[in-house]
Swiss-Prot record:
HAMAP family, A to Z: PEPcase_type1
Active-site residues, Swiss-Prot/TrEMBL: H167, K597
Record's keyword terms, sorted: Allosteric enzyme, Carbon dioxide fixation, Cytoplasm, Lyase, Magnesium, Phosphoprotein, Photosynthesis
Name of the protein this chain belongs to: Phosphoenolpyruvate carboxylase 3
Pathway participation: Photosynthesis; C4 acid pathway
Length: 960
C-alpha cells in the first residue's frame, strides 16, 4: 500500500502544478517529502503515513475545485485523533511544508545559477529572485549616459544601514534553522551534475539523518526568549554568514567596477553596508529590556567582535611572512620588540606562541595587535561575568582608530615595497571588516516611546517647582527645553522621586554614558508626535553625562503623525540650538506597521510617500542631509516585500545614497540564512540604492497624485468604518482569528499589547497582522482598497484608464498593487469562511460574509486594473510554488479552526479514532505533552494549535 501511496505524492504534485513550469521543483519536492514519509512510516508505522497522505489528498482536492465540503470532510478526520496522534499529524504536515519551502529555495538558487533571471521578476516573496545584480546595475547606469567616474564617486559616498530587529514571528527555532541549512546543502549537492555514486549514497544518508533529526526536535519554544537570547539569535547570522560575506561581496563590487573601466578598488574606508541591531536596545513597550540587558548585550557583542578579529589576525600572521618593509614599520617593530610584553611566552595561543623573530616585522606588529585583542575580549568577558576586570583600559582597544593604525601601517608598507598584490589579499579584507563592523560588530540602536521621556522631564519640572511639563503646550515646552540646552545648570537632582519607568529611562541613559560610544547607533523615539520629543531626549542625554550624545531620531508611525511630520522637522531645523548641534545630518524614521494598522495599507503607503517627499524638501531648504530610516516589517501588511522593488519605488530625491532599513526577525533567515542568500541581499541593497540615486523613478503626474490623494481618503474611511467604528468588529476579530491564543506562542520577548485591556488600538501591529495571516484573510492589507478603486471608477469611467496607466508607468503604484496581488494569491476566503462557521456567533456571521464579499470584489478590481486574467499570471514560478505549498497550509488551517473550536467550546462533539502511531498505541499517557495552561484545555490541543500557527506562518513566508 505504501508504495502505491508513494507514487501518488508525485502524481498529486504534478496534478496540482499548473503547466510544466519547473520540473526541478516537483522533483526536489517529491524527493524530500517521500523521504520524510518513509521516516514517518519507520518511526510510527504505516497507518500514520497513510493518514497524513490522505489529508494532503483531500486538501489538494479542495485546492483544485474549491469545494468547501472537502474542508468539513478533512475536519471530521482530524478532530477524532487522540492527543498524541494530533500532535504528530500537525508536526508531520509542518515538516512537509518546511521541506517544500526548502525545495523552493534550492530550485530558485539552481535556476539563478543557470541563467541570470530577467530583471524585475519576483518569484519568491522574500526577495531572492529579484535580481538587482551589482554588475548589471553598473553597466546599465553607464549605458544610460553616466560616466564610470560618476558611478564610482556615487558608490564611494553611499551608505546602507541594515538594522536587525527581534520581532521574531521568526516562528522557527534556531536548532531547526541549522538543520534546514544542512538539508538545503544536501539537496544542492545531490542535484549537482558531477555527483558520483558513492557521493550520492552518502548524501542520501545525510539527508535522511537531517530530516529525521529535524522531525525529532520539538518545534515549540518552551520558554519565552529573553532579549539576550534574541540578540544571540541575530548575532549568529553575523557570525555565520555576514562576517565573511561582506569582504566577498566588496570584492565583487571591485570586479564590477573593473568591468566598467575603473582600475582601482573601492577604498577600504568605504563600508557600503553597515549592521545595527535593536536586540537589547528596543525598550518600546518591552519591560524586559532593562539597563542591565543593554549593558550585557553591548559587552557581549564587543566580546564576539574581538573573538572574530583574533582569528582573522592569526590567519594574517601566517600570510604576512615577508621581511621587506618600509622604515616606519621596521622602527615600530623594533619598538614592539623592546617592550617586556613581547618577550613573554604565551602558552594560551596555539600559533605564534613564542617570541617572533625580528626578521618577520609584519608578524611582530600583528602579534601586538593580537595581544591587545585578546585583552579586549577578556576584559569584556570579565565585565559581563562579574562587573569588574583587572585588565586596565589602556591594555585594550577602546577606539577603532587604535585598531586600524597598525593595520594601515602594514598596508602602506606592503604597497611601498612593491607588494600591493599581497596587501590587497586578506589584509584588505580585514581592513574592510574593521570599517564595516567596528569594535562592536553591530551598533545597538536605543528605542523608547516618547511618553517615557515626557514622564522624566515632568518629574524634574514638578520637583523643581516650576509646574507640570506634561500640561504645558508645545511652544512652552520648546522654549523651556531650548533655554535649558543653552544653559549650563544641572537639572537632575539626586533626590528626584522616581517611578520604575523613570528609573529605567535614566538607568538606560547612564549605561550609554559608561560604555564606549561606538557601541551605539541613534536614539529612536517611537510614537513621536512633536519636535519637543526630540529636544527632551537631547536634554536628558546631556543630564546623564553622555559626552558624545547619540543622534536622536523621531519615528513617525500613525497617520496623523506622518501628516504632521514635515512641519515637526521644519520646526526642529528652524531652532538655532538644534541646527547647530546636528552638524548638517538628520535621520528620520517612518513606520509602516502602525500606520497600516491605523489607516489600512493603501492610505499608509501613500501617506508615507508624501511625508518622505515633503521632509526631503524641508531638509534641502535647511541644507541638511536627510537619511530616511524605513521601519518595514517582513509582511506586506507591515511594509514588507521584495527589497529592491521597495527601494526603487521610493519617491525621487529621498534616498540620495543613504538609507537605513530594518531587517525583521522573521525575514533575517530568508535574507542572510546562508552564504548565497547573504551575498544576494548585500548586492540588492547596494545596487538598488545606487540606481535610485543615479536613475531616480519618475515623479507622479499631477493628475495621478490627485486621484491617489482622493482614493487614500476613501480607503481610510472605509477601513476605519469597519475596524474602528463598526461595533461588532472587535468581537468578530477576537472570535474569527486565533488572536486571543497568540500570546501563548513564546514568539518574542515583548508582550502582544502596549497596554493591558482595550480594543484594536492597544494591540501591537504584529499580532494584529499575524492573526489575519493565520486565517488566510489578510484583512489589513486589502480592506479599503476595493472601495477606493470602485469610488474612482464610479466617479468617472475615464479613471479606469488612468489607473491602468498609473500601474504601468509609476513604480510606486505598481509595487503597491503587485504586493497586494501576491497577498491575494496566498489568501483564501473559503478558509476564512470555515473559521467563521465554526467560531463566530450566529449574529456575527452576516458581518463576516459581507467582509468576504468585499475581499472578492477587491481582488477582481485589482486584476482588471493590472490587466491580468488570473492571479499571478505574470509570475508562473511563484504560482507553481504556491500551488504545491497550499495543500499543506489548508490542512493546517482546517486543523487550527477545529482545534480552536475544541479549546473554546469543550462541549463540541468529537468521534474518537483508534490510535494511529505504533509508538503510542499501547500508552495511555503520551510523552512530551506540555500543558501551558493548567487544566483548562484537554491535553494536546495547545501543542497542536501552536504547531498549526507555526506551520501557517512558515507557509505564508511573510508572517507577522
Amino acid at each position: 500500500m505504501a508504495s502505491e501511496r508513494h507514487h501518488s505524492i508525485d502524481a498529486q504534485l504534478r496534478a496540482l502544478a499548473p503547466g510544466k513550469v519547473s520540473e526541478e521543483l516537483i522533483q526536489y519536492d517529491a524527493l524530500l517529502v517521500d523521504r520524510f514519509l518513509d521516516i514517518l512510516q519507520d518511526l510510527h508505522g504505516p497507518s500514520l503515513r497513510e493518514f497524513v497522505q490522505e489529508c494532503y489528498e483531500v486538501s489538494a482536492d479542495y485546492e483544485g475545485k474549491k469545494d468547501t465540503s472537502k474542508l468539513g470532510e478533512l475536519g471530521a478526520k482530524l478532530t477524532g485523533l487522540a492527543p498524541a496522534d494530533a500532535i504528530l499529524v500537525a508536526s508531520s504536515i509542518l515538516h512537509m511544508l518546511n521541506l517544500a519551502n526548502l525545495a523552493e529555495e534550492v530550485e530558485l538558487a539552481h535556476r539563478r545559477r543557470n541563467s541570470k533571471l530577467k530583471h524585475g521578476d519576483f518569484s519568491d516573496e522574500g526577495s531572492a529572485t529579484t535580481e538587482s545584480d551589482i554588475e548589471e546595475t553598473l553597466k546599465r547606469l553607464v549605458s544610460l549616459g553616466k560616466t564610470p567616474a560618476e558611478v564610482f564617486e556615487a558608490l564611494k559616498n553611499q551608505s546602507v544601514d541594515l538594522v536587525f530587529t527581534a520581532h521574531p514571528t521568526q516562528s522557527a527555532r534556531r536548532s531547526l534553522l541549522q538543520k534546514n541549512a544542512r538539508i538545503r546543502n544536501c539537496l544542492t549537492q545531490l542535484s549537482a551534475k558531477d555527483v558520483t555514486v558513492e557521493d550520492k549514497k552518502e548524501l542520501d544518508e545525510a539527508l535522511h539523518r537531517e530530516i529525521q533529526a529535524a522531525f525529532r526536535t520539538d518545534e515549540i519554544r518552551r520558554a519565552q526568549p529573553t532579549p539576550q537570547d534574541e540578540m544571540r539569535y541575530g548575532m549568529s547570522y553575523i557570525h555565520e554568514t555576514v562576517w565573511n560575506g561582506v569582504p566577498k561581496f566588496l570584492r565583487r563590487v571591485d570586479t564590477a567596477l573593473k568591468n566598467i573601466g575603473i582600475n582601482e578598488r573601492l577604498p577600504y574606508d568605504v563600508p557600503l553596508i553597515k549592521f545595527c541591531s535593536w536586540m537589547g536596545g528596543d525598550r518600546d513597550g518591552n519591560p524586559r529590556v532593562t539597563p542591565e540587558v543593554t549593558r550585557d548585550v553591548c559587552l557581549l557583542s564587543r566580546m564576539m567582535a574581538a573573538n572574530l578579529y583574533i582569528n582573522q589576525v592569526e590567519d594574517l600572521m601566517f600570510e604576512l611572512s615577508m621581511w621587506r618593509c618600509n622604515d616606519e614599520l621596521r622602527a615600530r617593530a623594533e619598538e614592539v620588540q623592546s617592550t617586556p610584553a613581547s618577550k613573554k611566552v604565551t602558552k594560551y595561543y596555539i600559533e605564534f606562541w613564542k617570541q617572533i623573530p625580528p626578521n618577520e616585522p609584519y608578524r611582530v606588529i600583528l602579534g601586538a595587535v593580537r595581544d591587545k585583542l585578546y585583552n579586549t575580549r577578556e576584559r569584556a568577558r570579565h565585565l559581563l561575568a562579574t562587573g569588574f576586570s583587572e585588565i586596565s583600559e589602556d591594555a585594550v582597544f577602546t577606539k577603532i582608530e587604535e585598531f586600524l593604525e597598525p593595520l594601515e601601517l602594514c598596508y602602506k608598507s606592503l604597497c611601498e615595497c612593491g607588494d600591493k598584490a599581497i596587501a590587497d589579499g586578506s589584509l584588505l579584507d580585514l581592513l574592510r571588516q574593521v570599517f564595516t563592523f567596528g569594535l562592536s560588530l553591530v551598533k545597538l540602536d536605543i528605542r523608547q516611546e516618547s511618553e517615557r521621556q515626557t514622564d522624566v522631564i515632568d518629574a524634574i519640572t514638578t520637583h523643581l517647582g516650576i509646574g507640570s511639563y506634561r500640561s504645558w503646550p508645545e511652544d512652552k515646552r520648546m522654549e523651556w527645553l531650548v533655554s535649558e540646552l543653552k544653559g549650563k545648570r544641572p537639572l537632575l537632582p539626586p533626590d528626584l522621586p522616581m517611578t520604575e519607568e523613570i528609573a529605567d529611562v535614566i538607568g538606560a541613559m547612564r549605561v550609554l554614558a559608561e560604555l564606549p560610544i561606538d557601541s551605539f547607533g541613534p536614539y529612536i523615539i517611537s510614537m513621536c508626535t512633536a519636535p519637543s520629543d526630540v529636544l527632551a531626549v537631547e536634554l536628558l542625554q546631556r543630564e546623564c553625562g553622555i559626552r558624545q550624545t547619540l543622534p536622536v531620531v523621531p519615528l513617525f508611525e500613525r497617520l496623523a503623525d506622518l501628516q504632521a511630520a514635515p512641519a515637526s522637522v521644519e520646526k526642529l531645523f528652524s531652532t538655532d540650538w538644534y541646527i547647530n548641534h546636528i552638524n548638517g545630518k538628520q535621520q528620520v524614521m517612518v513606520g509602516y506597521s502602525d500606520s497600516g494598522k491605523d489607516a489600512g495599507r493603501l492610505s499608509a503607503a501613500w501617506q508615507l510617500y508624501v511625508a518622505q517627499e515633503e521632509m526631503a524638501k524641508v531638509a534641502k531648504k535647511y541644507g541638511v542631509k536627510l537619511t530616511l530610516f524605513h521601519g518595514r516589517g517582513g509582511t506586506v501588511g507591515r511594509g514588507g516585500g521584495p527589497t529592491h522593488l521597495a527601494i526603487l519605488s521610493q519617491p525621487p530625491d529621498t534616498i540620495n545614497g543613504s538609507i537605513r532599513v530594518t531587517v525583521q526577525g522573521e525575514v533575517i533567515e530568508f535574507m542572510f540564512g546562508e552564504e548565497n542568500l547573504c551575498f544576494q541581499s548585500l548586492q540588492r541593497f547596494t545596487a538598488a540604492t545606487l540606481e535610485h540615486g543615479m536613475h531616480p523613478p519618475v515623479s507622479p503626474k499631477p493628475e495621478w497624485r490627485k486621484l491617489m490623494e482622493e482614493m487614500a481618503v476613501v480607503a481610510t474611511e472605509e477601513y476605519r468604518s469597519v475596524v474602528v467604528k463598526e461595533p461588532r468588529f472587535v468581537e468578530y476579530f477576537r472570535s474569527a482569528t486565533p488572536e486571543t491564543e497568540y500570546g501563548k506562542m513564546n514568539i518574542g520577548s515583548r508582550p502582544a499589547k502596549r497596554r493591558p485591556g482595550g480594543g484594536i488600538t492597544t494591540l501591537r501591529a504584529i499580532p494584529w497582522i499575524f492573526s489575519w495571516t493565520q486565517t488566510r484573510f489578510h484583512l489589513p492589507v486589502w480592506l479599503g482598497v476595493g472601495a477606493a478603486f470602485k469610488w474612482a471608477i464610479d466617479k468617472d469611467i475615464k479613471n479606469f484608464q488612468k489607473l491602468k496607466e498609473m500601474y504601468n508607468e509609476w513604480p510606486f503604484f505598481r509595487v503597491t498593487l503587485d504586493l497586494l496581488e501576491m497577498v491575494f494569491a496566498k489568501g483564501d476566503p473559503g478558509i476564512a469562511g470555515l473559521y467563521d462557521e465554526l467560531l463566530v456567533a450566529e449574529e456575527l456571521k452576516p458581518f463576516g460574509k459581507q467582509l468576504r464579499d468585499k475581499y472578492v470584489e477587491t481582488q477582481q478590481l485589482l486584476l482588471q486594473i493590472a490587466g491580468h486574467k488570473d492571479i499571478l499570471e505574470g509570475d508562473p514560478y511563484l504560482k507553481q510554488g504556491l500551488r504545491l505549498r497550499n495543500p499543506y497550509i489548508t490542512t493546517l488551517n482546517v486543523f487550527q479552526a477545529y482545534t480552536l473550536k475544541r479549546i473554546r467550546d469543550p462541549s463540541f462533539k468529537v468521534t474518537p479514532q483508534p490510535p494511529l502511531s505504533k509508538e503510542f498505541a499501547d500508552e495511555n499517557k503520551p510523552a512530551g505533552l506540555v500543558k501551558l495552561n493548567g487544566e483548562r484545555v484537554p491535553p494536546g490541543l495547545e501543542d497542536t494549535l501552536i504547531l498549526t500557527m507555526k506551520g501557517i506562518a512558515a507557509g505564508m513566508q511573510n508572517t507577522g
